[in-house]
């Protein structure tokens, strides 16, 4: 006979679902972690369960999670372990083969649980002698083990649904939308899922830290709720969108730096109220009448302008960074992959020339797939034009240019101004390359080693200077500029007065 355990912990502090394995059903010792669950965290109080006086088996061969409940076989012995809000334990025991049902640890909290199964306990159908006397009895409903199993599963579903509602109601009103998603996902979507992996859901007491880890097979469900969550492309963890911007688009699960829009980067780096954009009226035309079978180039530009609210794939302007006047250009990967066309190159060139004339430090944040193919050689020409302007800025005026490489930085941007900085800073785990992995493998027919185009690997090869996380970037830039004698305006004013 196969023995199955399901461990459910419900409390005011957390709502978690975990799978654990016990050594024995007669003498339940500490619960051990298995490969089904990768989270080894268990409080001491969670490691103790209760003895079963009526159990006739000593080994547990299998364990299940929330999604596995519905896949139980008729020969399974099923045990549910749970905890109420007062941390008092209770246990529910099912022997599906022998149709045995029991509850251990008689506590007042169990009365709520008993209601879920009262329809079965009080049913005359449990008494085989009375079945023939009931005209409403459905002979096919409980006569086979599969139906009995399905009924128990429905009871468990009903009970879990009620307890999730109790635990979720503790949360404040600001998490109502998340609560709705949580309940729908566990009790609705997962019911139709064929995935057998376990799922972990955690809600903290401050109401601002939601995390739901799921396997890559759940991408369809995630897309349905993408207006609430941002999924990490590395660990597939979900980040609550409401707080994602305040966390600088850094995944709460693995710390991966996800893509940021140019507007968010400007807001992150530039002091509030000091941003003055340049050349906003410039936009791309179709200089070579690029032919496309799918969508005309002009129409594609228009669609990206409506989607992003930008006129081109870069924003340029001047502002203050901790009081230090700077000229800054930030590329936006959401606009045609941050591709560099004639307008992007012209805006960068004008920014460099302005910084040269005003003796300002220069920052260029790179996020691009390379030169824009729809503009042909005109886009390639921007590489030389920008490099020429930077030569005058760096060599003749002796000013400081800081290049910041984000993910991805590839193609013509990498081959030109991306690698020309006096100081080159990279974000953690940034994808930096000239040609992409797919292009290299198809061209050379060789496999590109995994991670060979990541910032950490290239850092050890001396390709750039520091790797700086986003939360430290503004402070690092401020110190670098002050090291090169660029000081805040109020600091210069105080020096002049003295």
UniProtKB/Swiss-Prot annotation:
Family matches, as PROSITE patterns: COA_CT_NTER
Binding locations of Zn(2+): 232, 235, 251, 254
Main localization, broad class: plastid
InterPro entries: AcCoA_carboxyl_beta, Acetyl_CoA_COase_Trfase_b_su, ClpP/crotonase-like_dom_sf, COA_CT_N
GO biological process, one term: malonyl-CoA biosynthetic process
Zinc finger (C4-type): 232-254
Domain CoA carboxyltransferase N-terminal: 228-498
Cofactor annotation: Zn(2+)
EC category name: transferase
Free-text remark on how the cofactor is bound: Binds 1 zinc ion per subunit.
The protein's annotated pathway: Lipid metabolism; malonyl-CoA biosynthesis; malonyl-CoA from acetyl-CoA: step 1/1
Catalysed reactions, semicolon-separated: N(6)-carboxybiotinyl-L-lysyl-[protein] + acetyl-CoA = N(6)-biotinyl-L-lysyl-[protein] + malonyl-CoA
Keyword Nucleotide-binding: yes
MF (Gene Ontology): acetyl-CoA carboxylase activity; ATP binding; carboxyl- or carbamoyltransferase activity; zinc ion binding
Compartments, record wording: Plastid, Chloroplast stroma
EC number: 2.1.3.15
Keywords: ATP-binding, Chloroplast, Fatty acid biosynthesis, Fatty acid metabolism, Lipid biosynthesis, Lipid metabolism, Metal-binding, Nucleotide-binding, Plastid, Transferase, Zinc, Zinc-finger
Cellular component aspect of the GO annotation: acetyl-CoA carboxylase complex; chloroplast stroma
UniProt xrefs under Pfam families: Carboxyl_trans
Subunit-level organization: Acetyl-CoA carboxylase is a heterohexamer composed of biotin carboxyl carrier protein, biotin carboxylase and 2 subunits each of ACCase subunit alpha and ACCase plastid-coded subunit beta (accD).
Function (record text): Component of the acetyl coenzyme A carboxylase (ACC) complex. Biotin carboxylase (BC) catalyzes the carboxylation of biotin on its carrier protein (BCCP) and then the CO(2) group is transferred by the transcarboxylase to acetyl-CoA to form malonyl-CoA.
Family label: Belongs to the AccD/PCCB family.
Protein name (database record): Acetyl-coenzyme A carboxylase carboxyl transferase subunit beta, chloroplastic
């Amino acid at each position: 006979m196969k023995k199955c355990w399901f461990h459910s912990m419900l409390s005011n502090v957390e709502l978690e679902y975990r799978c654990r394995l016990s050594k024995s059903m007669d003498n339940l010792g500490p619960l051990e972690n298995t490969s089904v669950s990768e989270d080894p965290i268990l409080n001491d109080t969670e490691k103790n369960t209760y003895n079963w006086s009526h159990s006739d088996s000593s080994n547990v061969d299998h364990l299940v999670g929330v999604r596995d409940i519905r896949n139980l076989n008729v020969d399974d012995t099923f045990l549910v372990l749970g905890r109420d809000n007062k941390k008092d334990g209770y246990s529910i025991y099912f022997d599906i083969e022998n149709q045995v049902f029991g509850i251990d640890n008689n506590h007042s909290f169990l009365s709520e649980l008993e209601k879920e199964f009262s329809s079965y306990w009080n049913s005359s159908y449990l008494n085989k002698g009375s079945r023939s006397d009931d005209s409403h009895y459905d002979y096919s409903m409980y006569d086979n083990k599969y139906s009995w199993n399905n009924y128990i599963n429905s009871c468990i579903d009903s009970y879990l649904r009620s307890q999730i509602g109790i635990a979720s109601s503790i949360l404040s009103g600001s998490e109502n939308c998340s609560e709705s998603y949580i309940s729908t996902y566990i009790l609705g979507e997962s019911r139709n899922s064929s995935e057998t992996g376990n799922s972990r859901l955690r809600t903290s007491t401050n109401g601002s830290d939601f995390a739901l880890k799921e396997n890559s097979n759940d991408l369809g469900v995630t897309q349905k709720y993408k207006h609430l969550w941002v999924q990490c492309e590395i660990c597939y963890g979900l980040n609550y969108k409401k707080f994602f911007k305040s966390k600088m688009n850094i995944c709460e699960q693995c710390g991966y730096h996800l893509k940021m829009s140019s507007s968010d980067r400007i807001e992150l780096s530039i002091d509030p109220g000091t941003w003055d954009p340049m050349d906003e009226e410039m936009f791309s035309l179709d200089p070579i009448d690029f032919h496309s079978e799918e969508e005309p180039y002009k129409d594609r530009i228009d669609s990206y302008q409506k989607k992003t609210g930008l006129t081109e794939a870069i924003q340029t302007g001047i502002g203050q960074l901790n009081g230090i006047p700077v000229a800054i250009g930030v590329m936006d990967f959401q606009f045609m992959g941050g591709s560099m066309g004639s307008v992007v190159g012209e805006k960068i060139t004008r920014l460099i020339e302005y910084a040269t004339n005003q003796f300002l430090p220069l920052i260029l944040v790179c996020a691009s797939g390379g030169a824009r193919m729809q503009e042909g050689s005109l886009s390639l020409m921007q590489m030389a034009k920008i490099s020429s302007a930077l030569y005058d800025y760096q060599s003749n005026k002796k000013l400081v240019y800081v290049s910041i490489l984000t993910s991805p930085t590839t193609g013509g941007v990498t081959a030109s101004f991306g690698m020309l900085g006096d100081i080159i800073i990279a974000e953690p785990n940034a994808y930096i390359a000239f040609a992409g992995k797919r292009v290299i493998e198809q061209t050379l027919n060789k496999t590109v080693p995994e991670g060979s185009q990541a910032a950490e690997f290239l850092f050890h090869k001396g390709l750039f200077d520091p790797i700086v996380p986003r939360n430290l970037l503004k402070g690092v830039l401020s110190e670098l500029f002050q090291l090169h004698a660029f000081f805040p305006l109020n600091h210069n004013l105080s020096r002049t007065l003295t």
